[in-house]
C-alpha cells in the first residue's frame, strides 16, 4: 500500500489541482469565458499546499508501519495483490547484457517522448511503440521469440484483474451518463446555490462538484457538465467566474482519491492488494481535511473578490 501512496498520491498531488492542465483547467476556463491559465499565482500556492499535504500523509503512514508493521493495510489481508513477489535472494550485480538492456530501454523511452511530441502520438500509438520496444529489448536480452511471448503473457496475467476492475468502475460511470441519471443529480444539487449568498455559495459549489465527481471521475467530462451550469448561477449569485472555476477544480481534483468509480485508482488498489472499503476507511479523514480546506480557501477567495486577471 505504501507503493500506492508514493506513486498514485504522488501523481494526484500535482495533477488533481494542477495550475497548467490544459485538458481540465484550460477547458473549464475557456467554457467560463475567462483568460486561459489566468489566476496562476493562487493556483500554484494551492497546488504546492496539496503536494505538501499528501506528502505528509504518505510519511505518516510510512512511519506508522516502520514502527509497527502489523498496522500496514496489507497485514493479514485476504484480498491478494495482483503481483506475486518472490522472496528469493538474487545477485544484485548487473551483467554487461543487463546494462546493455537497460541502456536500450532508456534510449527507447527518450525516443518515445521525442516522437510523441514531434508526431503528436496518441495513447494507442504509444502503446504500439512500447509493444515493439518489448520485442527489441527481449532480443537484446538474449531471449528467443517464443521466450519473449511466454514472458509477455506471464507479465500480462497480474494486469488482467486490475484491468477488469478499472473497466468495471468506468462502465458504471458510462451507464449513469448515458442513462441521463447524472442530469437529474446535477439539477437537484444546483438548486441550493440559488438560495445562498456569494461567499457561502462559493463553498457550496465545491461540495456540489465533489458529489458530482463521484459519478463523473473524468475532469473534462465534469467540466462539460458543470461549467455551463455553474457560470450563469455564479453570475446570478455574485460569485466571480474565476472562483467558480476554482470550485470546480477543487471538487473534481480532490475527489479523485475518494470515488470508487475512478478506474485508474481502483486498478492501482487491486495491484497492491487493498480493497476499496479498507482504503476508504483509512483515507477518509485525510481526504475530508483536504476538501474542508478547499472549501475554506474558495470562500476566502470569493470574499476578497478574486478574479485572477
Each predicted region: which residue ranges?
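Hydrophobic transmembrane alpha-helices that form the pore/transport pathway of multi-pass ion
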Residues: 1-32, 215-249, 272
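Alpha-helical transmembrane segments of multi-pass membrane proteins
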Residues: 1-13, 39-43, 48, 198-213, ...
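Alpha-helical transmembrane segments of multipass membrane proteins
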Residues: 13-14, 46-54, 108-112, 209, ...
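Transmembrane alpha-helical segments and their short flanking loops
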Residues: 18-45, 81, 235-243, 263-309
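Hydrophobic, small-residue-rich membrane helices and short re-entrant helix-turn-helix hairpins
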Residues: 141-160, 276-282
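Loop-to-transmembrane-helix entry motif
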Residues: 155-159, 163, 192-196, 247, ...
Amino acid at each position: 500500500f505504501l507503493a500506492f501512496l508514493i506513486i498514485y498520491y504522488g501523481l494526484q498531488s500535482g495533477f488533481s489541482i494542477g495550475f497548467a492542465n490544459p485538458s481540465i483547467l484550460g477547458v473549464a476556463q475557456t467554457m467560463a469565458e475567462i483568460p486561459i491559465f489566468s489566476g496562476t499565482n493562487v493556483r500554484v500556492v494551492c497546488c504546492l499546499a496539496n503536494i505538501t499535504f499528501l506528502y505528509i500523509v504518505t510519511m505518516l503512514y510510512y512511519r506508522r508501519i516502520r514502527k509497527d508493521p502489523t498496522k500496514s493495510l496489507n497485514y493479514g489481508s485476504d484480498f491478494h495483490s495482483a503481483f506475486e513477489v518472490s522472496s528469493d535472494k538474487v545477485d544484485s550485480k548487473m551483467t554487461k547484457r543487463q546494462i546493455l538492456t537497460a541502456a536500450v530501454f532508456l534510449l527507447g523511452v527518450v525516443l518515445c517522448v521525442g516522437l510523441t511530441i514531434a508526431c503528436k502520438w496518441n495513447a494507442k500509438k504509444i502503446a504500439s511503440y512500447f509493444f515493439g520496444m518489448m520485442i527489441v529489448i527481449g532480443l537484446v536480452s538474449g531471449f528467443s521469440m517464443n521466450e519473449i511471448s511466454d514472458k509477455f503473457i506471464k507479465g500480462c496475467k497480474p494486469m488482467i484483474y486490475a484491468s477488469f476492475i478499472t473497466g468495471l468502475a468506468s462502465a458504471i460511470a458510462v451507464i449513469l451518463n448515458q442513462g441521463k441519471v447524472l442530469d437529474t443529480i446535477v439539477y437537484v444539487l444546483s438548486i441550493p446555490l440559488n438560495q445562498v449568498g456569494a461567499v457561502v455559495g462559493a463553498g457550496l459549489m465545491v461540495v456540489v462538484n465533489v458529489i458530482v465527481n463521484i459519478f463523473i471521475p473524468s475532469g473534462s467530462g465534469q467540466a462539460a457538465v458543470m461549467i455551463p451550469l455553474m457560470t450563469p448561477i455564479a453570475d446570478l449569485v455574485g460569485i466571480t467566474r474565476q472562483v467558480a472555476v476554482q470550485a470546480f477544480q477543487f471538487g473534481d481534483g480532490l475527489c479523485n482519491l475518494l470515488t470508487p468509480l475512478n478506474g485508474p485508482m481502483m486498478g492501482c488498489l487491486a495491484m497492491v492488494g487493498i480493497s476499496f472499503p479498507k482504503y476508504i476507511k483509512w483515507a477518509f479523514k485525510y481526504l475530508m481535511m483536504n476538501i474542508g480546506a478547499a472549501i475554506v480557501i474558495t470562500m476566502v477567495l470569493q470574499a476578497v473578490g478574486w478574479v485572477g486577471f
